[in-house]
Amino acid sequence: MVTASRRHLTERYASGVDLLLWETEKRLIPDLDAIKSVTGAAASGQAEGLDLGAALVLVQAARLGLDLLEHELFEAAHAMDMRPEAIAAVLDLPDAASARNRQRWLKARRAEAGGDPGEQRV
């Protein structure tokens, strides 16, 4: 679904160098550029429903990718013996329990994703 969304939005919104790279190398435009193109097109009434759906898929993929990165950082902090209190302070969380809850949620999110985001990228 993510790859199909990237392809659709590249075909619809690539221009300039991005269009040349798509036509010659089938290089997809970056996800955030694609999403911004859709929001701009929607604001001017030019976006189609399929464009909006594809952009939403990419937003979800980006969110998952960031959650997986955050989980890796929590794991690295744990490996360095960084205390939950310190993590909570950095993240502006109320307490160590909140940091531990966040880490558990991220671990569950990683498990739901299968641990390997595969085609995820931002």
Where do the PLM segments sit?
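General nucleic-acid-binding
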Residues: 1-46
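Alpha-helix initiation and N-capping motif
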Residues: 32, 49-52, 96
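Short, solvent-exposed charged binding patches
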Residues: 40-42, 57, 122
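Short, Lys/Arg-rich amphipathic alpha-helical interaction segments
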Residues: 83-122
